Amino acid sequence: MSLSLDLDLQIAVDSNQLPSQADFETWVRTALGNTLDTAELTIRLVEIAESQSLNHDYRGKDKPTNVLSFPFEAPPGMELPLLGDLVICVAVVEQEALEQNKPLQAHWAHMVIHGCLHLLGYDHIIDQEAEEMESLETQLIEGLGFSNPYKEA
């Protein structure tokens, strides 16, 4: 069964190195796999200031971060295909890829997959959950032809 995906890509930043809409759709489909028949989500690409503000307001951390996930919680009794929103800071993703000596496209794929897994309920606060999430991320990333994102470059 093929996933019916409605992806709203919002670009609130100037950059000439952004992946294409098709890239984002591929990465979202990879992350969601066969878990859903229909999915709606928004990916918003932002500047440092917006990322920092959201990270401060929602996580109490006064610094920008690579990806923030905002899962949608439907009211009881309502079945909606809306997964939620991902907010990705372009400058942080680009800087991390450079610092970690990773291809930019591979790091973008990792951040989108990582964020989507959060929308599906995965987390990495507890060590066991972190291992499960990282293992799944690695499997999905390698399935796209990229290297293990957690292996030191």
UniProtKB/Swiss-Prot annotation:
Record carries keyword Cell wall biogenesis/degradation: no
Leader peptide range in chain numbering: none
Co-factor requirement: Zn(2+)
GO cellular-component term (any): cytoplasm
GO MF annotation: an example: metalloendopeptidase activity
Cofactor binding comment, as recorded: Binds 1 zinc ion.
Binding site for Zn(2+): H114, H118, H124
Cystines in this chain: none
Keywords: Cytoplasm, Endonuclease, Hydrolase, Metal-binding, Nuclease, Ribosome biogenesis, rRNA processing, Zinc
PANTHER family reported in the protein's UniProt record: ENDORIBONUCLEASE YBEY, CHLOROPLASTIC (PTHR46986:SF1)
Similarity annotation: Belongs to the endoribonuclease YbeY family.
Main function: Single strand-specific metallo-endoribonuclease involved in late-stage 70S ribosome quality control and in maturation of the 3' terminus of the 16S rRNA.
HAMAP family: Endoribonucl_YbeY
Name under which the protein is recorded: Endoribonuclease YbeY
Organism: Shewanella denitrificans (strain OS217 / ATCC BAA-1090 / DSM 15013)
Name of the coding gene: ybeY
